């Protein structure tokens, strides 16, 4: 059977440009790097949409035996009474502390922010009452 040729006419294949159907063969490292780039782009878009969530510093001192490389904190900042710029985000126009539904913080973070705002007010870093903008017009 191998030596016999069939008399069936062969279908004609039209030549199509090679550029359209040329596939790129990617190595595993190239595929992984593309996946990382896509994931990083998604993370960046999510960071732009989310408000900055502050970190609560630890209460106790921890003895560090080994020095670990510091992890970069992109979207987070430590809450401290000295960071008046960060605390002013959580104060309304009249000088009142904004509620949780506006700040979108957890209950623990909201309590800590309120406590640090009160501390900063006592220290004189933040005002107790601020006049609304309509007052100056």
Swiss-Prot record:
One of its GO terms (cellular component) is chloroplast. InterPro entries: Ribosomal_bS18, Ribosomal_bS18_sf. One of its GO terms (biological process) is translation. The keyword RNA-binding applies. Keywords: Chloroplast, Plastid, Ribonucleoprotein, Ribosomal protein, RNA-binding, rRNA-binding. It is found in: Plastid, Chloroplast. GO terms for molecular function: small ribosomal subunit rRNA binding; structural constituent of ribosome. Part of the 30S ribosomal subunit. Belongs to the bacterial ribosomal protein bS18 family. HAMAP family: Ribosomal_bS18. This is Small ribosomal subunit protein bS18c. It comes from Chlamydomonas reinhardtii.
